[in-house]
Amino acid sequence: MSTIPSLGAVPRRRTVDADQVRRLVAEQFPQWAGLPVRPVARGGWDNFTFHLGDTMVARLPSAAEYALAVEKEQRWLPVLAPRLPLPIPVPLAEGKPGPDYPFAWSIYPWLEGEPASAERVADPVRFAVDLAGFLAALQCVDPTGAPPPGKHNWFRGGTLRTYDEQTRRALAKLDGHVDTGLARDIWKTALDARWDGVDRWFHGDVAEGNLLLGQGELTAVIDFGTCGAGDPACDMAVAWTLLTADGRQAFRERLSVDEATWARGRGWALWKTLVTCARTWGSADREAGEARRVLVEIGQ
């Protein structure tokens, strides 16, 4: 029997609208019942997020699989926050399932900032060093009792072999369009790179939308739904997906990343990018163009 975890079926997402959120808030948190509710401009996939007044947000999982992260975030984000050099969301309240919404949910403070992008970052090297400093601090938090990789975070922080089947399917679809030989070599190197087995805290989804900027500088890190303790190589993927070449080098130096961890991090970036390229190939939208750009970065 294989010991490699299975990702399972694609989650069946449900929709959530502002009226549902108003009812949940009124029923469970009457002190906030009069506050206006409106969707956040750039919502995520795993959760529907709504402004609750001007200073809070309600965050509601879109599927049962994503709801597994609620208890973890409620338990651990207050532990992590005082040990990190940048603000992270700390829950203000935990909501319960209601008549027309079946999952636990959360209320958080609203953290100001705009999502990071290469165009918005003022100084790419400083941004990379600041991000590395945040991740270094996260890795230093005592992992005793922390959640290991599992269904709550799609096995981030575990073995890359969990994603081998997805990666191979993407490579087959992209054959003849990209340098799949190079991609296969990078993937094999990542799979063969050994982890030292020392559990460290990781974020699990260090990406543009989860890094907030103020005046071009990193000011907050959000969305810890995939966090846990295990192999932190998954957090290295951002070195290729967002950072410049100079920033990538500064990031690696600040974190003192060894060859094996770097190779696995490159593999995490490759998996996500290949899957996106395969899904969007032939499209002219921003997501497709960005995935092709990142694939070039990974191959250099």
Question: For each of these PLM feature ranges, what is it?
Answer:
Residues 1-31:
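Juxta-kinase regulatory segment immediately upstream of eukaryotic protein kinase catalytic domains
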Residues 6, 42-45, 116, 226-232, ...:
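Helix-rich C-terminal or lid/interface subdomains of diverse kinases
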Residues 9-14, 34-161, 169-181, 196:
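ATP-binding pocket architecture of kinase catalytic cores
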Residues 16-17, 27, 174, 179, ...:
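Short linear X-Pro dipeptides
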Residues 18-22, 74, 245, 249:
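Short, surface-exposed alpha-helical segments at coil->helix boundaries
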Residues 45-52, 58, 91, 186-236:
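Active-site acidic catalytic loop and adjacent metal/ATP-binding pocket
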Residues 53-56, 85, 216, 241-244, ...:
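Short glycine/proline-enriched coil/turn segments at helix->beta-strand junctions
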